Every structure is written in C-alpha cells, then in structure tokens.
C-alpha cells in the first residue's frame, strides 16, 4: 500500500463487527469520511442529517464502497422528537446501538457585533443543543438497558482558548466539551465513555468555503500557523476517531485529543488572524454570501 502511513487505515479489519455507530452530520465532509472508515471496519453505520437527498445518496455510496450495512436517516438534531425518532429507527433496523459521533455542526466567520440574535442562536442550537439532544437521548437508552456505550464529540481547540470571529461556535463547542468531561465522570459507572477530538485544518468543501472564503485573501489562510506545514488528511482523523470509539481505548474517557499539526501552540484562537480584515472586506464577504443564498 502506497502513501504516507498517516494516510492508511490504522485499525484491524473487523474492529467494529456486530456494532452499530451513529454519525450525525454524516452525509458530507469529515462526518462522511469517519462514517465510511467505520463501515470498512465492520460497523453497522447510521448517518443522519437534515438534507434527505444528501444523506440517502451518501448512505448508498458508502455501502457500495464498503459492502457494509448503512442506514441514512433525515434528522434535525435541534429537535428532540426527531432525535428520538432517529434512534428508534436505528434500533429497529440494527437491534442495538453502541456508539455515537456528535459531528453535526454549523459555523461561519463574522465580527460578533455584526451578528443578529438569530445568527448566534442558529449555531448554538445545532452545536450545543444538538449535541446534548443526541447524547442525552442515547445515554438514557443505554442506562435504562444497562448497556455500555461510547460517545465521541468533534470539538475544536478554541473550545478552551476562545477565538474571535467565531464566537457562537466557540461558546457552543466549549459547552459541549464540558458536557463530555462532566458526563465521563457521572456516567462512567454505567460503562459509558465520552471523549472528544479537536481537529485543526482538514479541508472540506462545505466548511472551507464558509471559514476560508477567497474574499478575505491571505488573512483566511491557516497554513502559516501550522508548525507541521500541511493540512490534515481525512484518514488520520478517521483513524483517531475509530480508535476512540473502539475497545482499544477502553481506559480513555473524558479526554479531548488535539490533532491540528501544532496550530494552537502558535496562539490562541484559529481565527484571531482575521483581526487584519478590513470593514470593506467584511462587507464584500457578506454581500457575496447573500448572493450565494439568493
């Protein structure tokens, strides 16, 4: 097998045979990459998201690529009733659930004083409320059934350092990370582990267009802040996620592992460099975003 070691699958085939794992926001980007790898390792995979066509297409393509059982479900994690229905459908299909990846997210860059209340709430509702909606719904099932389980949150380093220009996301990710650590302590007695990953720059089509828009020029380029001098590869993030979901990490709980090439060591906040963006550039960006929506 060619390529650098970090671009290759790490865990042995069959690691998740007989287990079912749910990945929220699993139709695109990092969620899809993690889901496909879990399927390759033998997991029954459930991916969910708000866009039915995207989720169903992703489920079909992942199943075709891996030969695994993949269920795609439409679910808005902001709505507890939809979350409960999603888990019920997953149990109906696969019988039991063993892991959850809280990957669904929403984020965009903007000076905080330009944000509307609705814009702020839209991120909090998905990232913080959506994460605890899913975690509590599945955690309660596991506890009631005396079943162990694993939860993995996709976090960020600015959950503890803070960062300008992504304040709704920073607030939400910080709350979700504290929930991981708190529940790791509280639910350990039930055999439930909770951990988090804080990724750095892993290019994806959706997030990259919102967080690294070309309208902002070199101010939005993270490369100059990455000591290792490269972006992350999806496979190395998927390797870490699979490890934390597997029994190979059975003594790890309440942890948040950073995988960012050392970026956060060069200053708190991934987006604080946007301090150099002018008001006119922000105006141009907001105008471009409005044109894309229209």
What name fits each language-model region?
Residues 20, 25-29:
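Conserved glycine-rich cofactor-binding loop
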Residues 6, 196, 216-252, 257-261, ...:
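C-terminal helical subdomain
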Residues 101, 188, 193, 252-254:
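Short, small/polar-rich loop/turn modules that mediate ligand/substrate recognition or access, typified
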Residues 140, 144, 185-189, 250:
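Alpha-helical segment proximal to the catalytic Tyr-Lys
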Residues 111-112, 116-124, 222:
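Substrate-binding pocket helix/loop in short-chain dehydrogenase/reductase
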Residues 135, 172, 180:
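Active-site helix of classical SDR
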Residues 156:
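Residue(s) in the substrate-gating loop at a strand-loop-helix junction
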């Amino acid at each position: 097998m060619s390529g650098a070691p970090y671009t290759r699958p790490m865990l042995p085939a069959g690691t998740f045979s007989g287990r079912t794992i749910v990945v929220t926001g699993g139709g695109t980007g990092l969620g899809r990459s993690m889901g496909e790898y879990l399927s390759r390792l033998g997991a029954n995979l459930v991916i969910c998201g708000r866009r039915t066509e995207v989720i169903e297409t992703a489920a079909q393509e992942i199943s075709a690529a891996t030969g695994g059982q993949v269920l795609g479900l439409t679910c808005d994690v902001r709505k507890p009733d939809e979350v409960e229905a999603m888990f019920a459908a997953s149990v109906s299909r696969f019988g039991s659930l063993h892991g959850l990846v809280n990957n669904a997210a929403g984020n965009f860059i903007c000076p905080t004083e330009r944000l509307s209340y609705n814009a702020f709430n839209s991120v909090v509702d998905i990232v913080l409320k959506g994460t605890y909606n899913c975690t509590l719904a599945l955690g309660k099932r596991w506890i009631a059934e005396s079943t162990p389980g694993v939860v993995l949150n996709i976090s960020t380093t600015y959950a503890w350092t803070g960062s300008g220009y992504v304040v709704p996301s920073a607030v939400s990710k910080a709350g979700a990370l504290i929930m991981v650590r708190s529940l790791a302590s509280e639910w350990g007695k039930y055999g439930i582990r909770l951990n988090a990953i804080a990724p750095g720059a892993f290019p994806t089509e959706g997030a990259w267009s919102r967080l690294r828009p070309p309208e902002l020029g070199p101010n939005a380029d993270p490369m100059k802040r990455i000591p290792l001098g490269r972006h992350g590869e999806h496979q190395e993030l998927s390797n870490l996620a699979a490890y934390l979901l597997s029994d190979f990490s059975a003594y790890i709980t309440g942890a948040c592992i950073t995988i960012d090439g050392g970026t956060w060591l060069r200053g708190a906040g991934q987006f604080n460099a946007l301090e150099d963006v002018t008001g006119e550039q922000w105006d141009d960006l907001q105008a471009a975003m409005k044109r894309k929506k229209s």
